[in-house]
């Protein structure tokens, strides 16, 4: 499975909706799909499944606002 699909699969699992796959520009926090607890779960899943460590202190909500932005941020960390 391609990197992009892996990230979207993780997001779909955490948010419990396929809306993140259908609309990769959806504002995850504004729409209530991610909160602080879900963000921690997301970072743990990313580390476990993609072997990419994202320190919580480096997580900027504005830069991780949409699935598309998350994919871009993670590609930079690969």
From Swiss-Prot:
HAMAP family: DltC. The modification O-(pantetheine 4'-phosphoryl)serine is found at residue 36. This is D-alanyl carrier protein. 4'-phosphopantetheine is transferred from CoA to a specific serine of apo-DCP. Carrier protein involved in the D-alanylation of lipoteichoic acid (LTA). The loading of thioester-linked D-alanine onto DltC is catalyzed by D-alanine--D-alanyl carrier protein ligase DltA. The DltC-carried D-alanyl group is further transferred to cell membrane phosphatidylglycerol (PG) by forming an ester bond, probably catalyzed by DltD. D-alanylation of LTA plays an important role in modulating the properties of the cell wall in Gram-positive bacteria, influencing the net charge of the cell wall. GO terms for molecular function: D-alanyl carrier activity. Belongs to the DltC family.
